[in-house]
A protein has these predicted regions:
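Conserved alpha/beta core segments of nucleic-acid transaction machinery
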Residues: 213-217
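N-terminal, positively charged regions that mediate nucleic acid binding
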Residues: 1-41, 45-55, 59
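DNA-contacting interfaces and partner/effector-binding or oligomerization modules
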Residues: 46, 53, 57-77, 84-211
Length: 217
C-alpha cells in the first residue's frame, strides 16, 4: 500500500463526534465524488474502498441513512473495483443536500458544489472539509522523501474554494492546472505565517501517522 493509501486508511477510521464536522466532511466527499442523476438519485462513486466506507459511516451517523455499497469492476483498462452508494428516496436526498449546503450544477452532469461557507465557519469544520477532500482525491508523499500534499479538483471554482479554506490556516496552498483538472497543492519549503498545524485527524483523536499534519514553520 502506498503512503497516501495508509494515510487514507487511517483517516477513514476516524469519525468526528461533532455533527457539524461530519456534515462538512460529507459535503467535501460529495463535492468530489457525488452527483444527482437524471432520476433525482444521489449517487456517490469512488475507486477507493476506504473512501466509500467513510461515506457510508457518515451517512449512518449524521443522517441516519442505511444504504448498501454496490461494487463493480472498473470498465477502464486498469484493474480494480468501482464502489457506488446511491440514495433514491427523495426526502433523504433533500435532507443530505440541505444539510451539506450543496447545490446541483445541472449543466455539469448534476455535480455538486458548496453553496456558501456556512458549513466551514469553525476551524474544526474547515479541517473536516479538507479531510474529506483529501480522502476523495488527494495524495501525500512520505515526508522523509520530500514533502508534497495535493488534492485534485474537478473545476477551478472547487479548487479556489478549497485553497481559500486552507489559506485560513495561513498555509500557502496554490493551484495548478493539470490534465484538465485543477490541483490544490502544498510543497515542502512553503512559508507559513502561523505555527498552527493543519491536522487532518479528527479533533477527538490523536493522529496515528504524524505526516497527516501539514508542516508548520
Amino acid at each position: 500500500m502506498s503512503f497516501s493509501g495508509m494515510v487514507k486508511e487511517e483517516l477513514s477510521r476516524q469519525t468526528s463526534t461533532a455533527r457539524h464536522c461530519r456534515i462538512a466532511e460529507t459535503a467535501a466527499l460529495l463535492s468530489a465524488c457525488g452527483r444527482i442523476t437524471k432520476d433525482g438519485s444521489l449517487r456517490f462513486q469512488t475507486e477507493n474502498d476506504a473512501v466509500v466506507r467513510k461515506y457510508f459511516t457518515l451517512l449512518q451517523k449524521t443522517f441516519n441513512i442505511d444504504t448498501e455499497i454496490a461494487i463493480r469492476e472498473s470498465s477502464l483498462l486498469k484493474k480494480g473495483n468501482v464502489y457506488h452508494i446511491e440514495i433514491t428516496d427523495p426526502l433523504q436526498v433533500q435532507n443530505v443536500l440541505q444539510g451539506t449546503k450543496l447545490s446541483v450544477n445541472e449543466a455539469d452532469r448534476g455535480t455538486l458544489f458548496p453553496e456558501n461557507g456556512l458549513i466551514t465557519q469553525q476551524n474544526c469544520c474547515k479541517r473536516a472539509f479538507i479531510r474529506g477532500a483529501f480522502l476523495a482525491s488527494g495524495s501525500i508523499s512520505d515526508p522523509e522523501k520530500g514533502y508534497h500534499f495535493e488534492i485534485v479538483c474537478q473545476d477551478e471554482a472547487k479548487a479556489e474554494n478549497l485553497r481559500d479554506i486552507i489559506h485560513t490556516f495561513q498555509i500557502d496552498a496554490k493551484i495548478v492546472l493539470r490534465k484538465k483538472s485543477y490541483v490544490v497543492y502544498v510543497k515542502e519549503g512553503a512559508q507559513y505565517s502561523s505555527n498552527e498545524k493543519l491536522s487532518l485527524s479528527s479533533p477527538a483523536t490523536e493522529p496515528v501517522l504524524p505526516s497527516v499534519n501539514l508542516p508548520s514553520a
